[in-house]
Swiss-Prot record:
This is Ribonuclease H2 subunit C. The modification N-acetylmethionine is found at M1. One of its GO terms (cellular component) is nucleus. It holds the Pfam family RNase_H2_suC. PANTHER family: RIBONUCLEASE H2 SUBUNIT C.
Amino acid sequence: MKNPEEAADGKQRIHLRPGSLRGAAPAKLHLLPCDVLVSRPAPVDRFFTPAVRHDADGLQASFRGRGLRGEEVAVPPGFAGFVMVTEEKGEGLIGKLNFSGDAEDKADEAQEPLERDFDRLIGATGSFSHFTLWGLETVPGPDAKVHRALGWPSLAAAIHAQVPED
């Protein structure tokens, strides 16, 4: 169990349900240029039903009367995208998760209880290989934060690759 000092620091452990990755249904994602100031499920589908129009300049749609311009963005090669959800507190928090798949061999070991106040379980509800990135009135373009973030894996691989000796 964590001590009170760790609890005060706001540290949390996040446990991924690996089985949810295999069963994640394909999802169609839209990254909108807005904030949803709610920390609970929001009925976005009531307000955003994408009637996407294709033209020479890219994709067009509208959200609550505002014009949107968009583009399709692919997940970097070698990666997969997942839509993750946090399970409610207490839902399934019964023991230490076994990721090795050899539950029979580990059955005799004492299980460490998950801490209901600090641990979170997440699972995948959808998977994607691309998504639509929207901007207000203009296509986001290559300088968008999302494009820069998606470039990091290839940059990290390049700077950590071995340099051949001459």
